[in-house]
């Protein structure tokens, strides 16, 4: 009989199975519960604390309490962010954006979905030392833009100048043929490293990976003098040890080179540094075509055409910098720099045939041979003292000696009979000293007060030999005092400044001394618009003094018909400049639009007049000169962290009103840059049409140039191949003069600059820990030789 309680063995087995099933259900439930428990969310919105505008692409990073990375994201187009799949625990959330202070939020014992609401970030000028930026970023201020290069841009660059080309900044051009940084519209570019003004060859010496950011001053303050653009490279500061670098670019199919070597040694508070640059050029395909039209005093009209033949050009440029600095952080900085510049140009020769256009059989042979040598040693002493209550004092003294020697032989001959023989020799010595003192005070709410004194005094002794022996002794002095205040009212940033200037000049044996006092105010208004856009209005007044070469009371024979003559009666004049700038950023797109007007009454401009059977070229204070400028810069990228391009274009309209002439000239120009990177490879292409300049009666043409470069990087070594003007064989620069008595249209060619292949190599290494000297706030230099040049 079967019992009603069941079989004990069977009952025991079922009990065991049920227990196992219960355990698995409990474990599975715990896993599901744990999985849901781990899937926590953190969300919020980021705004600008000042104007409550949303902040796109702000960085949001979640870290553990010991700073280990957990998750990260960026805000979207509406300023929102979301972090999901977060485990329970305690965290720190950091929210940052370029130009703002980082906000830290403590999230202790996070166990549920959390909404942080609105997070406000306050303004700050940040330094991203040690942080990799995945996309080039920029923050704009009234006087400057702070730009952080991306990792992609740094990997595609072999030096600091290459990096500038990759960043595609508005109004900044990198001239690959002449290896220099330029500002569109003949502007003055000043370059610095950690606040210290340096030469452009030292920018080429920078290792891109050491560059934290570039402070692009497109509205420089009064303490920057006459600079139109200031580029300040902020680099990492070494602690101890040293570094060495080499940067070389050598033409393959012609003699064109740019080579730079540099090194630094650091010990405790001291730094020793040196750099040397050499730039050889040796061309045999240089020529000049020129068409001139003369209307002489006797009623004769002569239309003469110069048909150029290939000639020789040779140039060697040497730059040496030796530097010592001693710094006590937050106390003082002493910096001493010795600079030596030497440009040796033994040949800059033209030859060809001069033909009478009315009678092509009427020809003469022509040679125009020039040579020059220039050297300028300079000693720069700098002292900066940091005081209490955010105050700084700066003292700077620079002494420079400029020595210039030049020769020119111009001859016209027919059937080996010499018709015209011009032999000019110039020997010039110039001594100058520049002294400056600056005071700065940081106030509350980001306001700043600064003031300074500056004095520049020069003495020039020149000898001109051209059948006669002329000697000139000239003295020129310029003193100024300035004050500037920068403040902020809600969304409006403003800057008010004024400079009082005294300029004087005297020339021995000439009754043409002058002394002039001027007051030059300056105003800047900067307003942040909704979104990432802004508008800026700038208005300046400045005093312009004549150069010593223009003031020299001597004659220089140019050819059989023309003489160049200095004018000791020239006076300084004022320049009035107003600029309106609009800037817009949205995701990958950046737009910068500019409109400007400049007015110079009594401007010093060229003129020509008849004197007997000769035509005199000289300078005088004319009625006025005006220009209207409009330009637009569009930059897109990086796209997929691979491609970036920019397009610039604009119009220049010049109004030149002389005492006896009136001219109008309009120039349209454009420029395009494309950069692509893939892994260790980089490709870059640029094309630029002529930005032409017109003043007085002369149009000076810009460059019409193209360039393409392929590069490969391996650690600190980068090699590349560059081609200048790969698709053209007629590179030229044009100049025109519209004078009623002696007009010309001239084209200068250098055959080697077309399809010029250049091999490049950049290498940097360091040893030990690093340390860098402090930031030097000013640097002065005298680059005016003080002599009058001659020639066509």
Where are these predicted regions, by residue range?
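Membrane-proximal, glycine/serine-rich, low-complexity loop/turn segments characteristic
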Residues: 38, 61, 78-80, 101-103, ...
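Outer membrane beta-barrel strand-and-loop segments of large Gram-negative receptors
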Residues: 432-434, 565-567, 571, 577, ...
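Short, acidic Ser/Thr/Gly-rich low-complexity loop/linker segments typical of extracellular
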Residues: 65-80
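Face-selective signature of the C-terminal outer-membrane beta-barrel domain
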Residues: 317-345, 368-510, 589-597, 626-651, ...
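Short, ordered, surface-exposed loop/turn motifs in non-cytosolic proteins
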Residues: 50-64, 140
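A short, solvent-exposed loop/turn motif at the edges and junctions
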Residues: 63-68, 90, 94-106
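Outer-membrane beta-barrel translocator domains and adjoining extracellular loop/strand segments
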Residues: 285-301, 347-363, 405-416, 461-469, ...
